[in-house]
UniProtKB/Swiss-Prot annotation:
Belongs to the complex I subunit 2 family. The chain crosses the membrane at residues 17-37, 58-78, 87-107, 115-135, 166-186, 202-222, 232-252. It is a multi-pass membrane protein. Keywords: Electron transport, Membrane, Mitochondrion, Mitochondrion inner membrane, NAD, Respiratory chain, Translocase, Transmembrane, Transmembrane helix, Transport, Ubiquinone. This is NADH-ubiquinone oxidoreductase chain 2. It is found in: Mitochondrion inner membrane. It comes from Caenorhabditis briggsae. Its EC number is 7.1.1.2.
Amino acid sequence: MIVFISLFTIFLTVLSLLTNNIIVWWSIFLLMTVVFVLLNKSSKSYTSIFNYFVIQESLGLLFLLFSSGLLQFFIILLKIGVAPLHFWIFNVTNNIFNYALMWFLTFQKLPFLTILLQIFWLSSVYILLMGLLICYVQIFVMKSYKNLLIISSTESFNWIVLGLFFSMFNTLYLFVYYFLLMILLISKFSKSSGYNFVNWETALVFLNIPFSVSFFVKIFSLSEIFKFDSFFTLLLLFSMFLSVLAFSFWLINLSMKNNEELSGSNKMNYFIIFPLMVISII
């Protein structure tokens, strides 16, 4: 079923690129909501399903009502959960775990991303940069492992959206690596073992260790943003220090507890995928 849903999502993504019909786009929104419901029905995450359905379908109706490209652009930003319009995400993620959480943070957003590219508003770059600053402040004040992961994923996705406006091919290529990495990070996160995913590899990835996918996403996007506005680039670099302080909370906890219980943490997969990430530079 997962393979079928993944292929179906890729099909909807290609379809959204081939057409600019609003009715077709709205149909894609509806089908992606159905996909989310199917993935979470087996885990009985009814609260998350209800919240997601109400939010997405309400925004979908507003998307049909407003013919202005600018209003539709903001509606899609809100549907994806791009910062600073990500306030509704926590109402959905509270009751989803494992691969459903990974899907919601990554692949669920792919068809929306290609539609967003087609109705791009140039001045929205400043809104996305402001969203990054808000994410860094939120990361600094949060201490929940799961919420830190969600906010960090939202922040990384903002970088992906920024990069998409500058280079579509490079960003989609990095999105695939980002998707694979999130599979490794979130697959151990479940109701029965809520802290098993917090291992040294996870902490180092979110601290932007060189040659990790989050490192590449930020470097490529910063190099393009610097051509656009050097002041915001400098401000973002200073604000990134807040996220380092927040994720040091993970490092302190890891250094003070027995890590033998984290032995099944996919270490071999990390050693395999990290060298492959270097290829993305070439």
